[in-house]
Amino acid sequence: MKHLLIILSVLLLSSPVIGETSEEKQFIATTNIFVNTFSYILNKQNAVGFHFGKGFTDINEDNIEKGETIFLGVNYTYTLDCLQCDSIFILPLFGRGNTVYTTNDGSTYTYSRLDIYLLGGYRWYFENDLSVQFGMGPSSVNASKKSENLKSNKGYGNDVEDRVKKRRFELINHTPFLFIGYTF
């Protein structure tokens, strides 16, 4: 994590890429309330940055009441045309986090996770430097149990394990991504 912060600091504090002027836009911030990203524009088509967030899911199936995930990671954006125009984009994300599942009996199960997403989608860019991005694609979530706090012996931990195994790889992620961004 320390190395990630050092790399991002160097990118953010460095002068513009050769051939660019300081008046050109250099950063992109996007959000969808649960996920926030901050990226440094490398050139017309590429940006690199980090993402973080906290998501809540009301599951209410298979004895699992809800899930809460906290995560942090790095991302790279490539557009077929440009970052400051309407364009198709490819967005790989790599991150780490924790998910806490709460079952119907009040037990909690905490999982450490390593996430890899490869999103593809479309980015609409507006003249006021706002953008809207929609994407979806495959995901891989490698999760391992860190702890459990049992409130009963009903065996709900097996239901949580089954859910974690089902989400290990999804050809199309169960949640499409919709972001609103600002370039500055």
Each model region followed by its residue ranges:
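Short strand-turn segments of transmembrane beta-barrel domains in outer membranes
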Residues: 26-33
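Gram-negative (and chloroplast) outer-membrane scaffold detector with strong preference
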Residues: 39-134, 179-182
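Predominantly the C-terminal beta-signal and adjacent terminal strand-loop region
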Residues: 127-184
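Sec-dependent N-terminal signal peptides
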Residues: 4-15
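Acidic, glycine-rich calcium-binding repeat modules characteristic of RTX/beta-roll
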Residues: 36
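Boundary at the C-terminal end of the N-terminal hydrophobic targeting segment
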Residues: 17-21
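N-terminal "first-domain core" detector
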Residues: 23-25, 44
